[in-house]
Design a protein with these regions (language model features):
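Non-catalytic nucleic-acid substrate-recognition regions in nucleic-acid-modifying enzymes
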Residues: 2-142
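Short, charged/polar, Gly/Pro-enriched secondary-structure boundary elements
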Residues: 44-51, 162-165, 380-382
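A short, flexible beta-alpha/helix-coil linker loop
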Residues: 100-103, 162-163, 309-313
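C-terminal edge-of-domain segments
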Residues: 144-160, 372
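SAM-dependent Rossmann-like transferase core, predominantly class I methyltransferases
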Residues: 155-189
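Conserved S-adenosyl-L-methionine
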Residues: 178-296, 312-313, 317-319
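C-terminal catalytic and target-recognition region of SAM-dependent MTase-like enzymes
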Residues: 290-385
């Protein structure tokens, strides 16, 4: 079994720096690239990063990299890799994905088929199985991916399974919810800290509020779910349980939090409450049915984070314009509060009524969105009577 692995955390565009910071906080040196963060680590690193990374999509093992301009080079390159260190006899190993960009090899189904053939031949040789007899694939699954960029192939195994945004607490979702990992990333990009009040005035299924509590209380986002690697025979159940137990002990239950989520839709408020209950944070969040225009607060130095309906989520432009204008009017008196608003509407600032201090381009799935950032006037608490 290998002791050290070349690993990558895949990331949505625009969030790479957040994931890089998370990887470093776990104690691993890393290299931030477009769409991914590279790092090295042992089996424990595979477990820890899956369990703890809030803003990443998946953790993958890089099995190898080699030039591949023709199919024979692809076959020989895949065949040369040390598959015996990963795939036990009986393993299922679908070539689940092939991606070819700016390369001579561009037929992705053919890349999948040839890669599969090469892995089969290597395992038949290693396990002394006759070539004419198909390998039985009835054991744990190892999803293999092949990426060819500028004629260089990278072959990977996915350790995660379902994407990391699937935390295991979402009982039901709204029409177009923000993904949990993106919500966690935006919270980390904001200037919110656990000692500040936090309000999501368009909370939907409660994702921002739930992720905020999990960040504040140091709750590992992967504690309530399982991962692909847990089925693999070379990662011991004992080590997995040890890392999970360590994570559970780090939860900080003492912290006092001031987090509120509001939505105009009573049904969404109930869904948000159920999700918070499933996440184990129901006691930390106040959920209310309330219109945006009814939001008031006499607290200071708070943070508003909102993913209001936009694009396909609101069918009429008039409704969008009215909502954004109301947000601008209601948030304006909250001068010490910072506001972070995510939308794909490029005319947001004119509808809201003021220009953002900063704007950050992100992707909510495949949809390009902007995070409009308005920074509050910071005052010391004793200055306010």
């Amino acid at each position: 079994m290998k002791k050290e692995f070349n690993l990558i955390a895949t990331v949505a565009a625009g969030l790479e720096a957040v994931v890089g910071r998370e990887v470093r906080e776990l104690g691993y040196d890393c290299q931030v690239e477009n769409g991914r963060v590279r790092f090295q680590g042992d089996v424990r690193a595979i477990i820890e990063t899956n369990l703890w990374l809030r803003a990443a999509d998946r953790i993958k093992i890089i099995v190898g990299t080699f030039p591949a301009k023709i199919f024979e080079e692809l076959f020989q390159g895949v065949f040369a890799l040390d598959w015996e260190n990963y795939l036990p006899l009986g393993a299922r190993f679908p070539i689940s994905k092939a991606k070819c960009v700016k390369s001579k090899l561009h037929n992705e189904p053919s890349v999948q088929a040839i890669s599969k053939k090469a892995v089969v031949k290597k395992l038949q040789k290693h396990y002394a199985r006759p070539e004419g007899v198909p390998l039985m694939e009835n054991g744990p699954e190892f999803k293999i991916e092949v990426s060819i960029l500028k004629d260089v192939a990278t072959v990977m195994i996915d350790t995660t399974g379902s994407s990391l945004f699937k935390r295991g607490y979402r009982t039901e979702k709204g029409g177009a919810p923000i993904k949990e990992n993106m919500a966690a990333a935006i919270l980390q990009l904001s200037n919110w800290y656990p000692d500040k009040p936090l309000i999501d005035p368009t909370c939907g299924s409660g994702t921002f509020c739930i992720e905020a509590v999990m960040i504040a209380r140091k709750m590992a986002p992967g504690l309530r779910r399982s991962f692909a690697f847990e089925e693999w025979n070379w990662i011991s159940d004992r080590l997995i349980q040890e890392v999970r137990t360590e994570a559970a002990k780090k939860v900080d239950r003492e912290l006092e939090l001031d987090i509120m989520g509001c939505d105009i839709d009573a049904r969404m408020v109930e869904i948000a409450k159920a999700n918070a209950q499933a996440a184990g944070v129901a006691g930390d969040i106040t959920f209310k049915q309330m219109r945006v225009q009814d939001l008031r607060s006499d607290k200071i130095n708070g943070v508003i984070i909102s993913n209001p309906p936009y694009g396909e989520r609101l069918s009429d432009d008039a409704g969008v314009t009215k909502l954004y204008a109301e947000m601008g009017q209601v948030f304006a008196p909250l001068k010490t509060w910072s506001k972070f608003i995510l939308t794909s509407d490029e005319a947001f600032e004119s509808k809201y009524g003021s220009q953002a201090d900063k704007k950050r381009k992100l992707y909510n799935g495949t949809l390009k969105v902007d995070l409009y950032q308005y920074f509050g006037q910071r005052v010391k608490r004793q200055e306010v009577k």
